Structures are given as C-alpha cells and as structure tokens.
Design a protein with these regions (language model features):
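Extended, H/D-rich, highly charged conserved domains that either
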Residues: 1-161
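SIR2/sirtuin-family catalytic core signature
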Residues: 105-106, 154-267
C-alpha cells in the first residue's frame, strides 16, 4: 500500500472540509491509484474517510446513553409536552436514535418523529462534505449537494412554520448555515414579524460566543433584532448541572404539571 494522499486529506481535515471525530485511521491507496490523477485520488480518499467514519460510528453507537444527561431530560420534556403530536426532530448525527437508545424511556416515542438530515451510517448513505460554494468544478464532489444520495428533509420549511424551536448541541457553524440562514434572517427582520420561542442549548460560555457569532452572520448583523422580535434564550448545559432552575424554566414552557416536571428532571 502506498500512502499517496495523506497530505491532501490532512489539509481537508485541517480546514474543516472533512472531519474524523475520534478516528485514527490511516488513509492508504492501492498501487494502481498512483497512475490516477490527483483529483481521482482525492475522490477515493474522501470515500475512504466516509467508510472509516461509518465503521467508527456503528461501533460507538452501541454504547449506552446517560439517562440523566441534559439531552435526555430535554427528550423527556418533549414526551410530556402538551404539543407532543406536533413534534418533529431533525438530527444532524449519522447515528440512529433507536440504535443509540434502544432501552431508553423515550427511544420508541420518537422513532417516527426523527428525520436524519445527512443520512444514517446503518443505511450506508451518509452525506459528508461542505456547503454550496463557488469552488473549482473538479472538486464539486466535496459539496454535500452534489452527492447522488443527497435528499434532505424539508427542514427549512418546518423551521419557518414552527412556533417553538429547540436547537440542542449544534454549533450553527458555516458548514450547515444553508439550513438555518433563511430562518434566522427572517426572524430578525421587522417586515411581517412572527414571534417564535427559540431555545439553543450549548455547552458553556465559550460555545455561546461562537453561536452568537454565527447568529450575527446569519442575521446580517442584526442579532439585537433577533432577540427583540423573538423569545430567544441560550442555555448553557454546564450551568444547568449546578443550577436546575435554568432547566426547569425551559421545561415549564411545554409542561404545566409540577409532578410531571419533577419526573422529567429526576428519573
């Protein structure tokens, strides 16, 4: 085996075009690939990364989830919610909700409600790449929308149509901005304003700043208007651990009964 493409792959990983969370795979191409053009070798390298990522995720998704986590608490809130029948969940993960939480208290509840934006590793059809950009046409293959299996659900429409939106653990970074920009742009405009409840869960103060920077760009630097025209809150999960009141306030937006709220927080 000849490692002909390591430099290119490492460059793509470094600039965020590709990602390999927790992977330590070595990208190796067969001898005949030396005769191929650099573009063809890059295509094959991307496919190798995709296969390696799917293998890794299939392995780790068998691990049990923490039922006491903030994410699990939010999921239980949706189950007890007075708008349960109207919930739609969009997952940007490649792992199946049912597979990672087969024995959880909420896995079956959401089985039909979850839509996978970038495919599922169990189906072997994950979408890996960048957002739409004006790049060298020979490298169109690294853009998500050029993948022959790319067929995302109507998330943008549902965001526009929803009254309550909860975003959990997503950085709202540039690579997925095409799914969010139109929504946040509209919600920060005073033209025909429609007030919505928007809650964003993130880890800590550092990630909160990064999210606000992304929101600034997506609202054309009208973040103040986004706050003023909506009920927008950013909840830091690290703070929820020591201050359950923050989480209780969120749960009360959707659940009225105090006993139900207690059961959601304390399983």
């Amino acid at each position: 085996l000849i490692q002909t493409n390591a430099e290119t792959v490492n460059r793509l990983l470094k600039i965020g075009v590709l990602s390999k969370p927790g992977l330590s795979y070595i990208i190796c191409l067969s001898h005949e690939d030396v005769l191929n053009s650099p573009i063809e070798r890059d295509k094959k390298a991307v496919q190798l990364i995709k296969v390696g990522l799917m293998q890794y995720l299939i392995k780790i998704q068998k691990e049990a989830i923490n039922e006491n986590s903030i994410a699990a608490t939010v999921a239980r809130t949706f189950i007890k919610s007075n708008v349960n029948d109207e919930i739609v969940i969009y997952s940007f993960n490649y792992t199946s909700f049912g597979a990672i939480a087969p024995n959880s208290s909420f896995a079956m509840e959401f089985n039909d409600a979850v839509k996978y934006v970038h495919g599922l590793c169990l189906d072997g059809n994950i979408i890996l790449g960048t957002r739409d950009e004006n790049i060298d046409k020979n490298y169109d293959f690294i853009q998500k929308s050029f993948d022959s299996q790319y067929n995302p659900p109507a998330m943008v429409y549902d965001l526009m149509d929803a009254d309550d939106i909860t975003i959990f653990g997503h950085s709202l970074g540039i690579n997925d901005s095409q799914y969010f920009k139109a929504f946040f742009e509209r919600q920060s405009s005073s033209t025909n304003p429609q007030k919505k409840n928007i809650t964003i869960f993130t880890k800590d103060a550092k990630s909160e700043i990064e999210i606000k920077r992304s929101l600034q760009e997506m609202t054309n630097w009208n973040l103040t208007s986004l706050y003023g025209l909506n009920n927008l809150q950013i909840i830091k999960t690290d703070e929820c651990v020591n201050n359950p009141t923050l989480l209780r306030k969120y749960i009360k937006m959707y659940v009225d009964n105090e006993e139900d709220i207690d059961s959601i927080i304390h399983i």
